[in-house]
Amino acid sequence: MDNEVEKNIEIWKVKKLVQSLEKARGNGTSMISLVIPPKGQIPLYQKMLTDEYGTASNIKSRVNRLSVLSAITSTQQKLKLYNTLPKNGLVLYCGDIITEDGKEKKVTFDIEPYKPINTSLYLCDNKFHTEVLSELLQADDKFGFIVMDGQGTLFGSVSGNTRTVLHKFTVDLPKKHGRGGQSALRFARLREEKRHNYVRKVAEVAVQNFITNDKVNVKGLILAGSADFKTDLAKSELFDPRLACKVISIVDVSYGGENGFNQAIELSAEALANVKYVQEKKLLEAYFDEISQDTGKFCYGIDDTLKALDLGAVEKLIVFENLETIRYTFKDAEDNEVIKFAEPEAKDKSFAIDKATGQEMDVVSEEPLIEWLAANYKNFGATLEFITDKSSEGAQFVTGFGGIGAMLRYKVNFEQLVDESEDEYYDEDEGSDYDFI
């Protein structure tokens, strides 16, 4: 579970970075994109940058020449910080970008991908090339397929664009017997016994292929085939319950074997695409159930959610992936640290006023609340789930509940929480900075 949460956070970080990098533009060709695959040799790339520096010295435009040389130098300096290449490769972006107010700003990003990259790239342009990072974001979850008919069964997997046949075997099942009397009953018994043994073997081989070290190794399972075999397997007590609960689709195909596998992939494309969507819906349905049943084991809005985090009461922290709220750290007149929250474009700056003096407090730091939560959620014993607003439940969570909430370990009565000193998350005189329904 922790690995899954960590991976989702890495994906979210890359997604946010790609969004900001894609918007960046510069003058001339002074924005460098450098991608080094896992087996790349850092000294070779340093030599290439030295050669590029020599070539760039001949650029006629003085302004562009100086910008490009500066970007190459920044890239070289960043690369020197790496004695060894990270196991999944390295992506560097360096250069001068134009800010919203028309000024030039030097930026440098170094990204260690959360999974291996298979591309080598060096480009100087007026934009950063983020295609490699965008490819990382494409779903690479592995799904298992069991294609089962009267001739045999194929076990396969699909991950991204890769289709793999894991195992297949044939079976010789008796056909239905046309004669009547005792003979028909005996054949029916034999036939039923053979079918039962066939389902048993499929269930056993499924465990061998889709469970590793007592853990299911696929995101979901698709059962495919002609006739009733796939349904018999799904309903069978012989089918490992760890796999049974992973079945996301049962599809009818016209063939067995590899042709049936290909057809099953086509027919289940929508189910595969919707797995994350379905997971999000299930999470939010469980959250809304807590609210409708008034269990007290839920909260929403920034104030209550942060109180619950402080109490260690949060089991699952749920946050809209595009939450824009900023977390400000101030110092008041008595040198106390004060935490406040506001939208980035908030016109009302009263949240920054020191109540004791009426003066604006000094800003110590500011960062998106969502980034602070991603960095600190573990300290509160919680797990972190990012959601989108693409499902109806997600849209309701964002518009009706402020895009932040939690499922709690135990009931918390927020109305009875009385702070002994001025709470850093909540100001009773001013009320919340937010108006959540």
UniProtKB/Swiss-Prot annotation:
The entry's localization annotation reads: Cytoplasm
List residues modified as N5-methylglutamine: Q182
Report whether Ubl conjugation shows up as a keyword of the record: yes
Native source species: Saccharomyces cerevisiae (strain ATCC 204508 / S288c) (Baker's yeast)
Function recorded in the entry: Component of the eRF1-eRF3-GTP ternary complex, a ternary complex that mediates translation termination in response to the termination codons. The eRF1-eRF3-GTP complex binds to a stop codon in the ribosomal A-site. SUP45/eRF1 is responsible for stop codon recognition and inducing hydrolysis of peptidyl-tRNA. Following GTP hydrolysis by SUP35/eRF3, SUP35/eRF3 dissociates, permitting SUP45/eRF1 to accommodate fully in the A-site and mediate hydrolysis of peptidyl-tRNA.
- Keyword field: Cytoplasm, Isopeptide bond, Methylation, Phosphoprotein, Protein biosynthesis, Ubl conjugation
- Which Gene3D superfamilies did the record assign? 3.30.1330.30, eRF1 domain 1, eRF1 domain 2
Q: Which InterPro entries match?
A: eFR1_2_sf (IPR042226), eRF1_1_Pelota (IPR005140), eRF1_1_sf (IPR024049), eRF1_2 (IPR005141), eRF1_3 (IPR005142), Peptide_chain-rel_eRF1/aRF1 (IPR004403), Ribosomal_eL30-like_sf (IPR029064)
Cited SUPFAM superfamilies: L30e-like, N-terminal domain of eukaryotic peptide chain release factor subunit 1, ERF1, Translational machinery components
What PTMs does it carry? N5-methylated on Gln-182 by MTQ2.
The protein, known as:
Eukaryotic peptide chain release factor subunit 1
